[in-house]
C-alpha cells in the first residue's frame, strides 16, 4: 500500500499531516479482525466435527460430562466465590447460596433424570393411520451458543450449559466482559474438563459478541438486556436460528390490606436488595393499598435496618458492577422522595438500600428497569387500580402478590401476564427445578430449569411408523362415494 505524506511549503502555516500511522493502524485492526474471524470459524468447524461424530448422542457420554461438570464446580467452589467477590463484592455465603449451590443442584437433577427425560415418548397415531405407532424423539440441535450476563455470572452460564449438555449439544460459551474474574474461572474450569470441540469459552466484549453472532449456530441462548436481546434475535434471524431470550423488565410487587405486612416487608427487602438489587427478577417497585401504606413503610424500613444495618460497612452487602451503572443508579435516587437510605461510597461503587415514597409513574425511577438497590413505593386505592397499573405496562419478567385474599390472588394470576412469580414471597420461584423460568413478551421468550432446560435445547422430532400389513385404500384416488363417506367418518378421529 502506498504511503502518503502531505506537507506545507517553507512559507506555509499548515502543520505536516501524515496518514502513514493511520494506515498502519487500520492494517493492524483489519489483520486482527481477520484473525479473530478465522479463529471463530476454526472453533465452529471443530464443534461441528465433534457433533457429527455422534459422541454426544450417547446418554452415557452426556451423563459422564455432567458428572465431570458437577465435580469441577464442587472442586472450584472457593475459587468461584473469590471471583464473584472480585466482580461484584458478593460475600462467600451469598456466592454459594445464589450461584454455586443452585448450580450444583441443577446439574445433579439433570444427571439423575437424564435417562427418563430422553426416553422416546409413545403417542396415539389416530384411526386414520391404523395400524400405526406415533413417537416423539428428543434430539440435540447441534452447536449451541450461550451468552451470559454479569449479575449472576456463574449460575447463569453453567445452568444453561448443563441443559445443553444433557440434551446432547456442543457449546460455545460467551461470558460477560463486565465480570472478568468469574469469566476467567469459567474458562479455566471448562478447559480442564472438556475438549475445545465439545465445549469452549470465548472471553471478550462487544467485538467478540458481534463476531460470534455472525456465525451460524443451531441454537442461541441469551440472558441480558432487552436492547441486546433484540440485536441477538435480529442476527439469529439471518440464519433462522431458534433462540431463547431471558431478558428483564420492571417486576411489580403488590401488597393488599389482607397481607401479613411485616412478613411481606421482610421478604420484599430480601428479594430487592439481594446482590444490591442487580437481579433480573428483583421487585422493581411496590404497589401498596393506601389503608396499610404507613404500616408497610414502617416495616419496610425496620427490616432494611435489621437485615443490612450500616450497609456500606456490611461484609455481606456487595457493590454495583461498574462506574457506569453506579452513576446511572445514583441518578435515580430522588431526594424529594427518599425516606430511607441511599448513602453512596464512590471509591467502592456501593449504594445503600434506598426506599422512595411517594412515587408516581412519571418519576425517573419508573421509566426504566432500576437494576439496583432502589425501591420505589406507590400507593393505590385498591387492587383494581393496581391491576390496571400493571396491565398498562410491558409484560414483566416476574410479579409478586402479597395477600390472604383468594380474589386478589386469582385476579393477578389470571388477569395479568408475566413470566413467573410468587404469592406471598419474592424471587424464590427460581429455586425449584420443576418450575420453568422465563419471560413473556418484552421480558423474553423460552424457558429453562430442570426438565425444561433439557427440552429447550432439544428438538422434539415426530415419527409415525406405519404397518405394511394393511393399507387402507380410502385415501387414494379416485374418491368414489364409499371412500368419501369413510373419509368423513374417520377423518376427525
Model-derived features: where do they sit?
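Conserved C-terminal "lid"/linker of ANL adenylate-forming enzymes
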Residues: 3-27
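N-terminal Rossmann-like NAD(P)+-binding subdomain of aldehyde/semialdehyde dehydrogenases
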Residues: 22, 30-135
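ALDH superfamily catalytic-core signature
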Residues: 34, 194, 227-361, 423, ...
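Short, well-ordered beta-strand elements within core beta-sheets of diverse protein domains
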Residues: 49-55, 146, 253-255, 285-290, ...
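Structural signal for hydrophobic packing residues in well-ordered secondary-structure cores
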Residues: 55, 70-73, 77, 88, ...
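Residue-level signal for inorganic ion chemistry
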Residues: 62, 107, 168, 199, ...
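Rossmann-like NAD(P) dinucleotide-binding subdomain of oxidoreductase/dehydrogenase enzymes
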Residues: 127-263
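Conserved C-terminal structural/oligomerization subdomain of aldehyde/semialdehyde dehydrogenase
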Residues: 254, 305, 351-493
